[in-house]
Amino acid sequence: MNRHISEILEKYLGRIPSLTEYHTLKSQYKNIHRVNIFNKDIFISLIKKNKKKFFSDIDTSVSEIKKLVFDYFTKQEQTYSIGKLYTIIELQTILVTTYTDILGVLTTKGPDIFSSNVQYNTSSMQKIASDALNSMNIATISDKVMGRHNVSSLVCNVNSLMEEYLRRHNKSCICYGSYSLHLLNPEIKYGDIDILQTNSRTFLIDLAFLIKFITGYNVILLKVPYLKNYMVLKDQNDSHIIDSFNIRQETMQHIPKVLIDNIYIVDPTIQLLSMLKMLSQIDRLEDLAKNPDKLTIRFATLLEYVRNKYGIILNGNSNNMPMPATIDIKKRIITVDTKYYNFAYDKCYVYLDENSLSSDILSLNADDAVDFENVSNSAFLVNDKTLYTYFSNTVLLSGNDKIHEISSRGISAHILIYQALMKHDISIPLTDIVNSLIGRNKQPIYEIIPRDKKTGKHGIIDIEKDIITH
């Protein structure tokens, strides 16, 4: 038994380690030593500053914060399960090595904010957006309440923190969705702030601890199997606080961005295409039916941005958009004719099952597929003048084996997302797809082809119960 390691473990556990504890935990002695020497007083002062700046409405005393912190950092002394000890060590290590740089820094003076003038008056676009969405308002309203609509009372506090976080960490974290559009158009209301970042797990763990030490709430982190690299933070009532997609730094570098008030947002062009794509999902059409006004102002803002950026003339001349597409329902593959545009391929095979795409890419023996993770929700491969990709939403039919225009437009938008992420010029097809929204009549839904079913178990990080499952 190494005496130095044994002393580190004894100090950490508050007891002489058993032989089992020694031999299973000795590989962690460096991390344990970091926890042992961690200055809790400085840490508590950072928590106090975070509370004052972002959670001032929470009624927690300094003594309560101290107790919660010291209780957690001595929790191992009353824990004898090796599995739970490993969990405590892992979470404590993340906290002591990352908290200051990730969340503690938010309380210090930040760089000057360079105010942006990238704001849009969307009044001229309201009618076009409203008419376009009205032509797509064809779903029956569902009474089902989606999990994303159960919002925690802490969202406003976390939003305040996130605004500062996005400014301080704008190389590793960017936003999209309603908050990003609020920066373009202050009339847009937003709930939580949607983010993409390169260190999502670490950030959410640090945030979970901050909330725990300020509120005493037993918040948990959930990893959802059907959304890649996605984690959501929930409060003790199972209500949504914030979620985040993790992406690689390589993907982050590919994403077109716009800087507004020191915050990077996903280029609204990508967001418009993503919205057109998402409208093929039946759940989103149900949301549209429930609250068309909410989507109209967002849609109008995106259209106005794209019109300005690309100089698009809105005349209803859509040329070849949406691109012609046929579906093989049995194989669940859609073939899109892309030859009308200056792409590096003449057709596109759009798979509705991701495993089938992966299998076919493997059989092609090609190693140059690209994957933009949650930005595109698909890998892409160009091989022999054909683009191979996967579409993650439902596909609507307007007749027997006939793809509904909403879905064919969504699939065309998906292809344009690939073109944009690869830094290709999309001005002509983008102009056409925007004009394809004008002067359309409602088409009823004949059939809904279901989306790919993802299997797997939820992963969980529960600080209170010392559980980490992957």
UniProtKB/Swiss-Prot annotation:
Which GO-annotated molecular functions does the record name? ATP binding; poly(A) RNA polymerase activity
One GO biological-process annotation of the entry reads: mRNA processing
Q: What is its EC number?
A: 2.7.7.19
InterPro entries cross-referenced by the UniProt entry:
PolyA_pol_cat_Poxvir (IPR004976), PolyA_pol_cat_sf (IPR037265), PolyA_pol_nucTrfase_Poxvir (IPR024231), PolyA_pol_nucTrfase_sf_Poxvir (IPR038419), Poxvirus_polyA_pol_cat_C (IPR024397), Poxvirus_polyA_pol_cat_N (IPR024398), Poxvirus_polyA_pol_cat_N_sf (IPR038337)
Does the record bear S-adenosyl-L-methionine in its keywords? no
What catalytic reaction does the record list?
Answer: RNA(n) + ATP = RNA(n)-3'-adenine ribonucleotide + diphosphate
Gene3D superfamilies this protein is in? Poxvirus poly(A) polymerase, N domain (1.20.1270.320), Poxvirus poly(A) polymerase, nucleotidyltransferase domain (3.30.460.60)
Q: Spell out the coiled coil positions from the record.
A: none
Highest taxon listed in the record's lineage: Viruses
Active-site residues, record numbering mapped to chain: 192, 194
This protein's record includes keyword NADP: no
Cite the entry's keywords alphabetically. ATP-binding, mRNA processing, Nucleotide-binding, Transcription, Transferase
Which SUPFAM superfamilies does this one have?
Answer: Poly(A) polymerase catalytic subunit-like
Q: Which family does it belong to?
A: Belongs to the poxviridae poly(A) polymerase catalytic subunit family.
Task: Please give the subunit comment from the record.
Answer: Heterodimer of a large (catalytic) subunit and a small (regulatory) subunit.
What is this protein's function? Answer: Polymerase that creates the 3'-poly(A) tail of mRNA's.
Protein name, entry field: Poly(A) polymerase catalytic subunit
Q: Corresponding gene?
A: PAPL
